[in-house]
């Protein structure tokens, strides 16, 4: 069996993984994911047609959203889980198909059949056919390289939207227009009548809905847990057993804190859960100790030393070592064969974390990795509350430039560029960050400017929305019509599909001169890249000295 996956930055030789994913995903799982995406596109064909007929089904919307999320890099490695998801996709497809066919016949007096693509009809009961189908329906679905590139770019952007919409939905925030675009975009990726220009327009529309979805999630998080506050976050440990919670799901964080209170078990965040330390609703828990460790790719060593159980709420999961595999718990859309999965919450109920809590009680306290504190909680509400101070610092020359260094971290040695770039920035610059890219520089002693820390961490990757809001409000304060006229530069590190969504969102907002690295996406063809360069002046990283000179000159 073979595979072809190039959806992440670390793909082999920046061309594609064909034997096994660098992420650890085996070829059989990669092919099952391709089949699931194929059937989801078939579901979205009916859901998109249905909306034109007044047919909506929230169960269908949620199924597509959640299953797209399951295919994001480092979320789910479980062969059996994807087999089950494909089987369920047939049932969901039949459910929406029946509703749409009925309405179509009522309106037009004939069946929809002559318009239906193969992904809306394909069916098999033989699981072996799932695997062979995956090789057939993978990433090269068209003979046109640029069409393929744009279809993949659109699909990955929609995956990121689905991930953010999933988190908002968990907190009872939803937007039907987001679901509608999700279906429209997926259906478009199998429509051979669409031209390159049509797909470019859809990619830009994906950026629009990326902004809308991040705004929705910001609303969900802040209404549920308050606006993040500037916070000194502990990175040391205490002498109690603990649970390490990783991923992005704040609802899981809330329920874990509630259920561990008074048990003698401490809670620590890891990776992208670090920003949870800045939310007012979570600060009231005395057993919420702080953050343990660094970015996702270092988890093999750090999970080993944590000693207690680890709860993976979303990505990024690295295939666990046998030495601690029995301490890994997954939940939500995360999956890995051979580890304990905590089921989804019932309507109106909390998830049951009793098993992981009892496990923690039997474990030793975490081994100390480091001591001290790091700053966090500088989302848009906190920064804009001192906007006058920031504006004054710019006007009097204390702050010469802001550099947005949001995005993802990863294994590649080339990412040391971001550490060196942060160190090399002049003392009159401020770094605005969100996402796990922060771990490349958030523990450096970069000082402050008039009491404003030189690294302002807005939060998780979805909190890139905060950076956009900050830039827009600064443009208003300086009475600028074009956001590109601000002393703000963008040096973005990408890794997976949510970063694609963030990038498309920035492009939709008209942001130009984005530096992107550490490599350009393998799925972007030369012609598509030329469009991005010509229209948005996007460029790859080169080296610290060269990029720094250009960025400080506003180039």
From Swiss-Prot:
It comes from Natranaerobius thermophilus (strain ATCC BAA-1301 / DSM 18059 / JW/NM-WN-LF). The modification Cysteine persulfide is found at residue 408. It is found in: Cytoplasm. Catalyzes the reduction of hydroxylamine to form NH(3) and H(2)O. It comes from the Bacteria. Coiled coil: none annotated. GO terms for cellular component: cytoplasm. It is an enzyme of class 1 (oxidoreductase). Its main location: cytoplasm. This is Hydroxylamine reductase. GO terms for biological process: response to hydrogen peroxide.
């Amino acid at each position: 069996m073979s595979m072809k996956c190039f959806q992440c930055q670390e793909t082999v030789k920046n061309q594609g993984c064909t034997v096994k994913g660098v992420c650890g995903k085996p070829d059989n799982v990669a092919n099952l994911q391709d089949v699931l995406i194929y059937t989801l596109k078939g579901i979205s064909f009916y859901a998109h047609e249905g909306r034109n007929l007044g047919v909506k089904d929230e169960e269908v919307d949620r199924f597509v959203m959640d299953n797209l999320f399951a295919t994001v890099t480092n979320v789910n490695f479980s062969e059996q889980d994807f087999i089950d998801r494909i089987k369920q996709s047939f049932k969901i497809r039949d459910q929406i198909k029946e509703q749409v066919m009925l309405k179509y016949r009522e309106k037009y007096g004939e069946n929809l059949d002559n318009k239906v693509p193969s992904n809306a009809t394909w069916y098999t009961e033989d699981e072996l056919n799932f695997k062979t189908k995956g090789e057939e329906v993978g990433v090269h679905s068209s003979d046109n390289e640029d069409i393929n590139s744009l279809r993949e770019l659109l699909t990955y952007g929609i995956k990121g939207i689905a991930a953010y919409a999933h988190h908002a939905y968990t907190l009872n925030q939803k937007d039907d227009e987001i679901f509608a675009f999700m279906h429209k975009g997926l259906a478009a990726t199998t429509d051979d009548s669409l031209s390159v220009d049509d797909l470019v327009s859809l990619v830009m529309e994906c950026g629009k809905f990326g902004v809308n979805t991040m705004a929705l999630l910001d609303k969900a998080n802040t209404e549920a847990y308050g606006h993040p506050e500037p916070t000194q976050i502990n990175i040391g440990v205490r002498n109690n057993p603990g649970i390490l919670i990783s991923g992005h799901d704040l609802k899981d964080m809330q329920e874990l804190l509630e259920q561990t209170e008074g048990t003698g078990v401490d809670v620590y965040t890891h990776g992208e859960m670090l920003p949870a330390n800045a939310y007012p609703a979570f600060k009231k828990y005395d057993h919420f100790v702080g953050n343990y460790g660094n970015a996702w790719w270092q988890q093999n060593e750090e999970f080993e030393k944590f000693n207690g159980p680890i709860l993976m709420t979303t990505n990024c999961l690295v295939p666990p070592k046998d030495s601690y595999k029995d301490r890994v718990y997954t939940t939500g859309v995360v999956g890995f064969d051979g580890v304990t999965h905590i089921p989804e919450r019932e309507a109106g109920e909390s998830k049951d974390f009793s098993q992981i809590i009892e496990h923690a009680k039997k474990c030793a306290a975490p081994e100390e990795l480091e001591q001290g504190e790091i700053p966090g909680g500088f989302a848009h509400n906190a920064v804009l509350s001192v906007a006058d101070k920031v504006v004054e610092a710019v006007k009097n020359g204390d702050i010469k430039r802001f550099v947005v260094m949001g995005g993802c971290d990863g294994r590649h040695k080339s990412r040391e560029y971001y550490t060196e770039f942060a160190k090399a920035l002049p003392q009159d610059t401020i770094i605005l960050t969100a996402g796990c890219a922060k771990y490349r520089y958030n523990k450096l002693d970069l000082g402050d400017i008039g009491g404003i820390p030189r690294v302002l961490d807005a939060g998780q990757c979805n909190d890139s929305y905060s950076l956009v809001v900050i830039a827009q409000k600064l443009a208003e304060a300086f009475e600028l019509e074009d956001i590109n006229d601000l002393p703000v530069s963008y040096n973005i590190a990408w890794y997976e599909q949510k970063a694609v969504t963030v990038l498309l969102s920035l492009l939709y907002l008209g942001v130009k001169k984005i530096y992107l690295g550490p490599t350009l996406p393998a799925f972007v063809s030369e012609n598509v890249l030329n469009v991005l360069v010509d229209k948005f002046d996007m460029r790859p990283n080169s080296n610290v000295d060269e990029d720094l000179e250009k960025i400080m000159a506003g180039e």
